[in-house]
């Protein structure tokens, strides 16, 4: 197997917990503090803008213990906030403008208008495509 020919960032940023370039820190903290089935269901719903795609996802939704997910979210927050700035390794940046997790505005602020491709997609656009190549070709 050869080296990767491209590295694509999709629906996120190098600053995942950041008021201007990711998720606002206070919103993320509130999500961790109040995390439970209702918060998770809201998160899943916000990944989509098409109820049919949400239903498709929910039909095979991940089944993990709530306490495990909450611990993972808290550990992720701690790691992100303690980390040094990350080097941009991506050759392609796709901003999802209908994203209700990472707003399109924050994604554009993070990547820059001149370096990102903007698509009117939700946070989880995968059900709209046959495969990864189909998504990259859109």
Regions found by a protein language model. Name each.
Residues 16-59:
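Helix-rich cap/lid subdomain of alpha/beta-hydrolase
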Residues 2-34, 72-74, 128-131:
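Flexible "cap/lid" loop of the alpha/beta hydrolase fold
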Residues 56-82, 86-88:
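Hydrophobic, aromatic-rich cap/lid helix
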Residues 96, 100-106:
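Conserved alpha/beta-hydrolase "acid-adjacent" motif
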Residues 87, 93-95:
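Short beta-strand/loop motif that positions the catalytic acidic residue
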Residues 5, 89-90:
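Short coil/turn segments at beta-strand junctions that form active-site/ligand-binding loops
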Residues 114-138:
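Catalytic active-site module of serine/aspartate enzymes centered on a nucleophile-bearing elbow/loop
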Residues 105-115:
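Active-site-adjacent alpha-helix of alpha/beta-hydrolase-fold enzymes
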């Amino acid at each position: 197997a050869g080296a990767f020919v491209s590295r694509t960032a999709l629906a996120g940023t190098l600053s995942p917990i950041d008021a201007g370039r990711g998720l606002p820190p206070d919103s993320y903290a509130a999500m961790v503090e109040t995390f439970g089935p209702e918060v998770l269901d809201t998160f899943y719903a916000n990944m989509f803008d098409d109820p049919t795609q949400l239903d498709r996802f929910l039909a095979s939704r991940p089944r993990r213990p709530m306490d495990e997910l909450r611990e993972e979210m808290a550990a992720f927050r701690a790691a992100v906030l303690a980390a040094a700035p990350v080097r941009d390794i991506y050759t392609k940046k796709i901003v999802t403008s209908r994203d209700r997790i990472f707003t399109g505005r924050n994604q554009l602020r993070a990547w820059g208008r001149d370096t990102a491709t903007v698509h009117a997609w939700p946070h989880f656009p995968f059900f709209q495509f046959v495969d990864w190549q189909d998504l990259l070709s859109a």
